[in-house]
């Protein structure tokens, strides 16, 4: 049995630290990406091209879709023929740690499609569960096998200085690690991520089908500095959820004992929902979660991705689009803050952060 990454001197850097590259997966699942994913593929392409200006992009695409992906992207990416069940690189890719000598270690968590038999979103996730180890192998990186501990990359944020941010709603959900206590889960995170402290936010974003991943509700933008999804509408269920998170963050400190500067990032003013026009585009397999008209989607500007040269921020043709860009521009003065039309990614169930996974320098 290998020593824990913490004992070996590894830690998880912050996303805003320098990247070697970014991992993404070409979107092809008919039950996630309506109408053959045409609009999603355009959105993915814009994201990939923006990230590629400052770092390498590795794209997992199966042979059957290679020529299609190449028609969109040409030689802008490194193509890898690794099979997947869907395109959520954040959740299926490895969490890559570094040590002070610059060596890397890829953590391979168990993946069960956000809840397994309890409330998972699809039944066959065998390929997804292998993505982390296969990608690490392609990069010739050593792997720390954290299985059978179930975790998705979207469920954790790191400040690179010993603090991990999570939500109770996700990590304590019955579909993840029901046989472990909160204390055992926390200890596994600290040992596997080389961290000193876990901060447990109560909630994520209302109706987020990942059981409320942290990456949709809060994110580190610097040491002791976070953004938090917010609404002033007291009738929106999100209000009480964000308020509980804010109250916790206001009384917490990071691993170094510093209090947080908290920036409130509004959610879109208009609720994002699945429409009647969207529905015919989805083709589901047996046992797969199905969309319905009027279903509220978990839209949040917090689901941005910090690349080397840019911060990619979801846009929803909403009055708060520009507000979010302005707030994040102040948080990231040294990066270009780029708005990306993102409804077509949201229709798949996530957003820009969910389809990207950083590979630290």
Swiss-Prot record:
Top-level taxon of the source organism: Bacteria
Species annotation: Streptococcus pneumoniae (strain Hungary19A-6)
Catalytic reaction annotation: agmatine + H2O = N-carbamoylputrescine + NH4(+)
The gene coding this protein: aguA
Protein name in the entry: Putative agmatine deiminase
Class in the EC hierarchy, top level: hydrolase
EC number(s) per entry: 3.5.3.12
InterPro entries with a match to the protein in the record: Agmatine_deiminase, Peptidyl-Arg-deiminase_porph
PANTHER family given in the database record: AGMATINE DEIMINASE-RELATED
GO molecular function per UniProt: agmatine deiminase activity; protein-arginine deiminase activity
Family named by the database record: Belongs to the agmatine deiminase family.
Catalytic residues of the enzyme: 354
Keywords from the UniProt entry: Hydrolase
A Pfam family it matches: PAD_porph
Organism classification: Bacteria, Bacillati, Bacillota, Bacilli, Lactobacillales
Listed NCBIfam families: agmatine_aguA (TIGR03380), PRK13551.1 (NF010070)
GO biological process, one term: putrescine biosynthetic process
């Amino acid at each position: 049995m290998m020593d824990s990454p913490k004992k070996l001197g590894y830690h998880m850097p912050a996303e805003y630290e320098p990247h070697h590259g970014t991992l993404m997966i070409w979107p092809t699942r008919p039950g996630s990406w309506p109408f053959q994913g045409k609009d999603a593929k355009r959105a993915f392409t814009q994201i990939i091209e923006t990230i590629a200006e400052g770092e390498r992009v590795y794209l997992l695409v199966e042979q059957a879709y290679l020529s299609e992906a190449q028609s969109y992207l040409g030689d802008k990416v490194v193509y890898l023929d690794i099979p997947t069940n869907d395109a959520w690189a954040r959740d299926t890719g490895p969490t890559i740690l570094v040590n002070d000598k610059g060596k890397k270690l890829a953590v391979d968590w168990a993946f069960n499609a956000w809840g397994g038999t309890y409330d998972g979103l699809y039944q066959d996730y065998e390929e997804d569960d292998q993505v982390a180890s296969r990608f690490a192998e392609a990069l010739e990186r050593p792997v720390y096998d954290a299985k059978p501990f179930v975790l998705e990359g979207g469920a954790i944020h790191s400040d690179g200085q010993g603090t991990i941010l999570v939500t109770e709603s996700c990590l304590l959900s019955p579909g993840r690690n029901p046989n472990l206590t909160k204390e055992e889960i926390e200890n596994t995170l600290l040992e596997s991520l080389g961290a000193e402290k876990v901060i447990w936010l109560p909630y994520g974003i209302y109706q987020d089908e990942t059981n409320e991943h942290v990456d949709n509700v809060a994110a580190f933008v610097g040491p002791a500095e976070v953004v938090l999804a917010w609404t002033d509408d007291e009738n929106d269920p999100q209000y009480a959820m964000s308020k509980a998170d804010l109250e916790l963050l206001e009384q917490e400190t990071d691993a170094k004992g510093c209090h947080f500067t908290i920036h409130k990032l509004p959610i879109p003013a208009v609720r994002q929902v699945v429409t009647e026009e969207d529905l015919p585009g989805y083709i589901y397999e047996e046992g797969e979660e199905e969309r319905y008209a009027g279903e509220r989607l978990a839209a949040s500007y917090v689901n941005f991705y910090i690349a080397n040269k840019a911060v990619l921020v979801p846009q929803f043709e909403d009055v708060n689009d520009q507000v979010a860009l302005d707030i994040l521009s102040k948080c990231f003065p040294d990066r270009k803050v780029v708005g990306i039309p993102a409804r077509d990614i949201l229709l798949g169930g996530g957003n820009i952060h969910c389809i990207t996974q950083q590979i630290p320098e």
